[in-house]
Regions:
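Transmembrane beta-barrel strands of outer-membrane/channel proteins
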Residues: 1, 36-42, 65, 74-78, ...
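Aromatic- and glycine-enriched pocket-lining scaffold segments that form the walls
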Residues: 1-48
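Solvent-exposed loop segments that connect transmembrane elements
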Residues: 1-13, 48-50, 82-103, 174-191
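Outer-membrane beta-barrel "beta-signal"
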Residues: 20, 114, 191-206
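Short loop/turn motifs that connect adjacent beta-strands in outer-membrane beta-barrel proteins
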Residues: 27-34, 69, 118-128, 159, ...
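Gram-negative outer-membrane beta-barrel proteins
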Residues: 28-30, 42-50, 71, 80-86, ...
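Transmembrane beta-strands of outer-membrane beta-barrel proteins
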Residues: 32-38, 61, 70-74, 112, ...
Length: 206
């Protein structure tokens, strides 16, 4: 593996990566703030078998706002990866949680989030935050279906304990997908464009 990111199971790895980010925050006094920014990434991809290299890059623009109890986030990101000396350069292989997944080499990501912070004084519970998160991944290959995710839920904060309870409605979500032969390819060519629903509880202790 590499400290920069991922290693492709076909022997393609990242190297010589550069990241930059610029952001500015507008203070609205007692109302809150709005932060806008842009970021970029540029680096090389190395085929460890052949020694050949090519480039990869990603660019993003984001907005974050806090207005009283309301919190809003918007982001657009674009990524292009050019794996050298591979039979099919339309995808790269990335690993997450011990599973290799094919991901479209060229794709756009659209994401948004809306939440509301509710102070609570009920035993150890200090805050409840209902939220709605949306994301969509569009791919450069016209015949590959988009990945779409709706996440509706709430976060309960109690001291060092954080509990996310949500309903996930998605098309092509890698972890809301049957664990069959299509699981590893939903971020590339094997998204069947079917809506699936899952109930999720995530507990964190910090």
């Amino acid at each position: 593996s590499t400290s920069a990111g991922y290693i492709d199971t076909r022997g393609v790895t990242e190297q010589h990566q550069f990241n930059a980010k610029v952001a500015y925050s507008f203070d609205h006094g007692g109302l809150g703030f709005t932060k806008v920014g842009v970021s970029g990434q540029r680096g090389q991809l190395l085929n460890q078998g052949t020694g050949e290299t090519d480039w990869h890059a990603a660019y993003a623009a984001h907005l974050q706002g806090r207005y009283g109890g309301f919190e809003a986030k918007l982001e657009f990101a674009q990524q292009e990866l050019n794996p050298p000396s591979v039979t099919d350069d339309r995808f790269v292989v990335m690993g997450a949680y011990g599973s290799p997944n094919r991901v479209a080499s060229e794709h756009n990501v659209y994401s948004s989030s809306l939440a509301y912070h509710i102070p609570v004084n009920a035993g150890p519970i200090s805050e409840i935050k209902p939220y709605y998160d949306f994301s969509q991944v569009t791919k450069d290959v016209d015949t590959w279906n988009d990945n779409v995710n709706h996440d509706i839920g709430f976060l309960t904060s109690a001291g060092p304990l954080f509990v996310y309870t949500d309903l996930i409605i998605s098309k092509g979500h890698p972890f809301n997908q049957p664990f069959d032969g299509t699981f590893s390819g939903v971020m590339a060519e094997q998204n069947d464009n079917e809506w699936r629903t899952a109930f999720n509880v995530n507990i964190g202790f910090y």
